[in-house]
Amino acid sequence: MISNFGHIVKTYLSNFPKDDYPVLDTFKFVSIWLGLVLDQSQTSMRSMFKRLNLRGETVDISTFSKASKKRDVGVFREIIFSLKKELSKRKEIKQGELEIFPLDSTIVSITSKLMWNLGFHQVKVFSGINLSTGIPGGIVIHFGQGHDNKYGNETIEETPENGVAVMDRGFCDLQRIKRLQKENNKYHVLRIKNNIKLEKLANDNYMVGTGKNKIESRVVIFTHDNSEFRLVTNLPIESKEIEGVSDEKIAEIYKKRWQIELLWKFLKMHLKLNRLIAKNENAIGIQIYTCIIAYLILKLLVIPKEAGTTMLDKLRYLQAFMCEKISYVHWLRELALR
């Protein structure tokens, strides 16, 4: 195998304790979750544990489920933080360069009847993705239902300095726009709803909305596929801090919002975020964070050019070699002990 996967495992996983619990230590616990997400040959937790038990791993699914209910999700957040820190080193951002940060939420179905009985049938996950670095950020898990205009503030706050938060109509709220206008060195491009009143002013800005919440803002209007797009933004036409941004450029920035949808698509199609098999809130958080960890590992992974260059190529490359090692649990232990 020609890749840096072994280095990634030793750097970010091998330091976790291998003897802090008698049956299911932290290293094995994290390895099982990663195996569940990364192993394309496994379709359920039960089938994964069947393979593990047949090949010498004594931990059972009941012990794993209990651990998933009680173990600290901070371990998984710590891995995410370390991987993101390493990824950020790989891309040098030029001074004055705008970092585009499209963000959105996605709905993930819960399969556990125990959670259904508690009134939870789905989870809404918020995230953005920095297109300069490829790093997801501002990951927030919200149980239950609710419109994006009521939530998502934590994700928006993760917009990097000199970054542009790109949002769809679901995030449209006049009070939110007021807050965003006050941000220093952070910008936004937000599509507003078609029923919001616009009044053009003498300075070419618009008065957005009516009543006490109305606000003056730059608005860019364009049409695409017979649909009108009205974008509120605080990006300047002229500025000393950054290069001026034309209306056409703002329209192009908004079209990059689709990149966050591609993130959700990859996580759901290939890293098993399409349905949550965990049976409690803590375990659901762990499953979601594990999907993000797997995504970041793939971002860091380097494989031979002839094997491909896409994230899916990398996942398939790992799968081809994992098949020689019984499971990811066996393979990660072998790599960590080298």
Curated annotation (Swiss-Prot):
InterPro entries reported for this sequence: RNaseH-like_sf, Transpos_IS4, Transposase_11
Domain of life of the source: Bacteria
Pfam entry (one): DDE_Tnp_1
UniProt-listed GO biological process terms: DNA transposition
Keywords for the protein's UniProt record, in alphabetical order: DNA recombination, DNA-binding, Transposable element, Transposition
Molecular function GO terms recorded: DNA binding; transposase activity
Annotated signal peptide: none
Family the entry assigns: Belongs to the transposase 11 family.
Protein name: Putative transposase for insertion sequence element IS4SA
Native source organism of the sequence: Synechocystis sp. (strain ATCC 27184 / PCC 6803 / Kazusa)
